[in-house]
Amino acid sequence: MGGYGGVKMEGMLKGEGPGPLPPLLQQYVELRDRYPDYLLLFQVGDFYECFGEDAERLARALGLVLTHKTSKDFTTPMAGIPIRAFDAYAERLLKMGFRLAVADQVEPAEEAEGLVRREVTQLLTPGTLTQEALLPREANYLAAIATGDGWGLAFLDVSTGEFKGTLLKSKSALYDELFRHRPAEVLLAPELRENEAFVAEFRKRFPVMLSEAPFEPQGEGPLALRRAQGALLAYARATQGGALSVRPFRLYDPGAFVRLPEASLKALEVFEPLRGQDTLFGVLDETRTAPGRRLLQAWLRHPLLERGPLEARLDRVERFVREGALREGVRRLLFRLADLERLATRLELSRASPRDLAALRRSLEILPELKGLLGEEVGLPDLSGLLEELRAALVEDPPLKVSEGGLIREGYDPDLDALRRAHAEGVAYFLDLEAREKERTGIPTLKVGYNAVFGYYLEVTRPYYEKVPQEYRPVQTLKDRQRYTLPEMKERERELYRLEALIKRREEEVFLALRERARKEAEALREAARILAELDVYAALAEVAVRHGYTRPRFGERLRIRAGRHPVVERRTAFVPNDLEMAHELVLVTGPNMAGKSTFLRQTALIALLAQIGSFVPAEEAELPLFDGIYTRIGASDDLAGGKSTFMVEMEEVALVLKEATERSLVLLDEVGRGTSSLDGVAIATALAEALHERRCYTLFATHYFELTALALPRLKNLHVAAKEEEGGLVFYHQVLPGPASKSYGVEVAEMAGLPKEVVERARALLSAMAARREGALEEVLERLLALDPDRLTPLEALRFLHELKALALGLPLGSMKG
């Protein structure tokens, strides 16, 4: 049918005219309707085209000029992208949230009987990509979430075959794992999709594509997890045309690693910056391979709890630190490696291109050199047989597609060589023909040429027309020349075409056999990729350590850091190192704003995190406990869209700390309680400090509440960040020193921030008056206490007296604390 004015409907296409649709558009609509959730990119010659309302969507998304496809009885909007630029446009569309169905011409136009046959050859969604040009270097996870006996969460990276999952007890734990893995696409079980409140909250926290799939249980384990596994496999098979390369499912337990809640990952800027562009991962990422980069991210997601594996990692990093020439040699070779992990997947899916096999050959050529540097103990599999096969078979620089031809070396396949010789003889006939015909006809300008329309021809210029033999058959007349053919030329030409088709077919057969030979080594390639990724991370961490002066940490019961630094901040500006020593203590850190309290807290946590992935740390010396969790409450992170204030978010994060932190946890608290009144804030901060002290956590608590520094807690230690008023104003020394700060310097910081002079002076006057009143009130409290005879007070009088003392201490009118 023809056009319509409403929503896209099956069998219809937006446009104008009585119809019916021409055959090309009928074919387009039929394919489009098979994939209603996808944007169909429909090959027409050298372009992928969209028609109707999809053309309008494509034009809006990419800023393309909208044209029209016009036939006798119908006109429809049209927009397209050139096939040569497909990867760039597809990447943009996927990031915008489009699912793409790619319909290619599956037969040559010249061989088609009528309309060229087209089929959907690719379904592209953000979480199911295998195409190297479209994939990020990071892991590209598709996630599925189901409920039942807990929250079942499973991940699948279609590009590598990684398949894993976990069963979680709470929604907050679910969100932590999702934030840690950052999937590109998420499948929600029906009971979650139908929960509007959950979907709204989920979309706000995780702005990724949400998709649907059948959640039929598959595999073993708890029902919720089996449902999530089944959904991933069903969706991945649907987008991959049934072909899938997946490793055995791995059940993992987040509790087997250091606990890093979402708030900690955010506050410490492990993967995403709070401002600017710098992150811990960015500082550490000196990797040379894509699998190495993904492995480093995995280590940061899941720091280790056990000393043995950590010491083993540190030993390997230290070797590369000590042996600079070895480190440089290994890194130089690793830089030349292809992404063997993803290449192995494309081999198993039978999607590896000639250039993939060439990249595999170059990578395998590096393995003997690496073994020469590191010795056989490196454990790389023997792939020399495959390397020799690839060397013998592939030309140096093969084309992207098999259909382009010219990818198999001469001498590799006898049948192909025989066909090529026959073809060369056929070409030689035409080369010799020019000389023979020049001599026979006496036409010195005669030439043999070729074009796609007429094939081979003889060309004669105007001055020699009278010498053209009668047997020459004209095929084309130009301004000053004519073109001819001979019966024997057509016979020879047909034979050449036949040989070219046979050569192309044989090359494809040889290539497929070669790819199958490589596919059989896919597991060995994955093992090589795993070993090389570990080498890459060890060498990268060593490079960072040498370049920036890191040291190997030791593990013990105390936390002792000498000249510690913040690994990210020190890259941007001159940095003042600081010491810290504590053991199951509550350390209060006071000092003015901007002095560096938050940086000091963060650097301590980052040093601990680095140590527990097996990295050297930014310090002159470091001894650390093995922490079971790193918990933070740092910075304002209100959730206004969700109806939560800064204070509410702060209290939720503090509640998580109190729920989970143990005596083996590192806890960082920055200005807890500032989002409410000062009285409430002091009370909450005091109660929190007492609770964490009782729990024996390793706690660093930065605060402006000087009341906390006087708490009578046996394991409380006071530190302050040094600052001093000098003639030019307040000077920050960024040094952390023993004892509490003498004052908060709030007015001085306000002056530095540019508050008007009259406002600053008024603030100083008010501060002096308040301090005087407080001092006078305290003196009066002391006098009244000294004059008191407790033996003569009734219980009611004693209670009233305490209320009066508290009112005096707080500067309130007497009687205001009663009742």
UniProtKB/Swiss-Prot annotation:
Gene Ontology biological process terms from the UniProt entry: mismatch repair
Keywords: ATP-binding, DNA damage, DNA repair, DNA-binding, Nucleotide-binding
Region of interest called A1, as start-end residue ranges on this chain: 2-130
Region described as B: spans on this chain: 275-570
Pfam families linked: MutS_I (PF01624), MutS_II (PF05188), MutS_III (PF05192), MutS_IV (PF05190), MutS_V (PF00488)
Subunit note: Homotetramer.
Protein name, as recorded: DNA mismatch repair protein MutS
Source organism of the structure: Thermus thermophilus (strain ATCC 27634 / DSM 579 / HB8)
Gene name as annotated: mutS
